[in-house]
Amino acid sequence: MKTKLITRAGYNKLKQELDYLWKEQRPEITQKVSWAASLGDRSENADYTYNKRLLRQIDRRVRFLSKLLPELKIVDYSPQQEGKVFFGAWVEIENEAGEVKKFRIVGPEEIYGDAKDYISIDSPMARALLKKQVDEEFQVHTPTGIKEWFINSIEYEKGEL
C-alpha cells in the first residue's frame, strides 16, 4: 500500500497540474473536438480522433488528481527533524566503494516526470534511512544482498510553507 504523504511542494505541483488541465488544456481540446466534429464525417477525421483521445487522457488524469489530492497528507518541515532523516529530507549517502548518491525522500505520488533524484518513503532505502543521523552507517536489504551505506549529510527545504 502506498503511503499518502506528500511534501508541500509536491502537493502544490499536483494542484497546479490539475488546475492547468481543468481550466486551460481541457477547454482548448474540447473546442478543437467541437470544431473537428463540425467538419462532418468523423470516421476519417484525424483531428477529431486525435483530440478525442487526448480529451479522454486529460479527463482520466483530472479524475485521478481530483480523487488523490483530498486523500494526501501534507508534511511540512519541523525544526524537530533537524539532524535526523525523516520525510522530505535531502540525504547524501556513500558506500565503501566511494559511490555517492543524493536524493530526497518523498511520497510515491511525487515521483514522476523529472524527479529522478527522489525516492519513495515506501522504498527499502528510505525505510532503512529513517531516524538515522549524519555519520551513521546503515544497511539496506536488496535483491543482490545486504548493502552498507554511510550518511554524509541531511538537509531540509525550510522555505516550503
Swiss-Prot record:
Entry keywords, A to Z: DNA-binding, Transcription, Transcription regulation
GO biological process, one term: DNA-templated transcription elongation
InterPro entries to which the protein is assigned, alphabetical: GreA/GreB_C_sf, TF_GreA/GreB_CS, Tscrpt_elong_fac_GreA/B, Tscrpt_elong_fac_GreA/B_C, Tscrpt_elong_fac_GreA/B_fam, Tscrpt_elong_fac_GreA/B_N, Tscrpt_elong_fac_GreA/B_N_sf, Tscrpt_elong_fac_GreB
Any one Pfam family match given in the protein's UniProt record, by short name: GreA_GreB_N
Domain of life: Bacteria
Functional summary from the UniProt entry: Necessary for efficient RNA polymerase transcription elongation past template-encoded arresting sites. The arresting sites in DNA have the property of trapping a certain fraction of elongating RNA polymerases that pass through, resulting in locked ternary complexes. Cleavage of the nascent transcript by cleavage factors such as GreA or GreB allows the resumption of elongation from the new 3'terminus. GreB releases sequences of up to 9 nucleotides in length.
Entry similarity comment: Belongs to the GreA/GreB family. GreB subfamily.
PANTHER family (alphabetical): TRANSCRIPTION ELONGATION FACTOR GREA, TRANSCRIPTION ELONGATION FACTOR GREB
Protein name as it appears in the record: Transcription elongation factor GreB
Recorded name of the encoding gene: greB
